[in-house]
Regions:
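An exposed, glycine/acidic-rich loop-and-rim segment of catalytic or binding clefts
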Residues: 2-347
């Protein structure tokens, strides 16, 4: 493992001066993260010809992340994904949230974790730990907590993201990372020829506002079936209502890991030969094919467009606070929220 490098990463609107932290292992994989948003800024891995490939979309500096609207590289919290009606009831008390997606709440509203300065509380050559204090009432949620996010790079080309928090009241916690992956390289265009396998037999269909109906439906015989590896674009334009409503894939798949940290997905770049495995202990994964990216100016002159990337956002199911048959959405007072997701790369 090479020595951790730290450099300036621009300046924010309020005058804060974020830093960029670079980790690099002996296999040539490099990970860049920032204390602005605890953001995953860049991941570089070697392709089948030993050439370095930047496999996540991103911006030149902190200003890009501050001004961006697509949650590129973002640590999303306190609750990722959607809450119907922008309201949650905890212990009989209604808590109103921001309506920022029609009448619903998406990714906890406009005051997002990813556009705040986090504090580095620990770092080494192979890891960086960020901390954000989220006070009682933050984003409308009850309870204060200190959210810790640790990025760890290992010598086997694995990047692990570890989330930890202990709330002082019962509250919603559902964290994710919203990185956009293109395994052929961040400037290489469409990912529709990437191949994907999901270890999932079911998904949670949603309505026209992307709020789950409460059903859990089998993928059997549908374009949602990725149990056998197939191209992302093989059926993305099928005349299938969930795909029409989502403008492509933007759905939660039900995972079979039963709370264990296990492999849940695999994606392969058709040109680079780079394979990315996704491991998690979370019950769901949102696969999003960047259906609404348009003329997004990224780093090194890149301009990102629709379906130029795929997100695999490990999570609790969307709107779990309103669906009794979905996994528990509330983290109890004094309990530890502790979850890991890893992205492992190989050829």
């Amino acid at each position: 493992m090479e020595k951790l490098q730290i450099q300036k990463f621009g300046i924010t609107k309020d005058g804060s001066k974020p830093y960029l932290y670079k980790m690099k292992n002996d296999a040539g994989m490099e990970v860049q993260v920032s204390d602005f948003g605890a953001t995953l800024v860049n991941v570089t891995v070697l392709d089948q010809d030993k050439n370095p490939v930047e496999v996540v979309l991103g911006y030149e500096d902190a200003a890009g992340y501050e001004n961006g609207t697509a949650a590129i590289g973002a640590i999303v919290g306190r609750n990722a994904n959607r809450i119907g009606g922008a309201c949650v009831t905890i212990n009989g008390i209604d808590y109103k949230l921001a309506e920022n997606d029609g009448k619903n709440n998406l990714h906890s509203g406009p005051d997002v974790y990813q556009k705040r300065m986090w504090r580095v509380v620990e770092n080494g050559d192979d890891h960086v730990t960020f901390l954000l204090h989220s006070p009682d009432g933050d984003q409308g949620y009850p309870g204060a907590l200190d959210m810790k996010v640790t990025y760890t790079l290992d010598e086997e080309n694995g990047l692990t993201i570890h989330y930890e928090a202990v709330p002082d009241q019962d509250t919603v916690i559902n964290m994710t990372n919203h990185s956009y992956f293109n395994l052929n390289g961040h400037k290489s265009g469409s990912v529709l020829h990437h191949r994907m396998q999901l270890l999932s037999d079911a998904f949670t269909p949603a309505d026209a506002q992307s709020i789950p109906t409460g059903e859990v439906c089998s993928v059997d015989g549908t374009p949602m079936d990725f149990r056998s590896t197939k191209e992302l674009g093989a059926e993305i334009d099928a005349a299938y209502e969930p795909l029409i409503l989502g403008n492509g894939y933007d759905h939660n798949w039900v995972l079979k890991n039963e709370g264990r940290f296990d492999k849940v997905a695999e994606v392969t770049g058709d040109e680079s030969g780079i394979v990315m495995e996704v491991w998690t202990d979370r019950p769901g994964v949102q696969v999003y094919t960047a259906n609404f990216l348009e003329n997004e100016a990224g780093r090194n002159g890149a301009v990102y467009q629709k379906r130029d990337a795929v997100c695999l956002e490990t999570q609790n199911y969307p709107d779990a606070v309103h669906q009794k048959n979905f996994p528990e959405a509330i983290c109890k007072k004094g309990e530890t929220y502790d979850t890991k997701t890893a992205y492992r790369f190989h050829i």
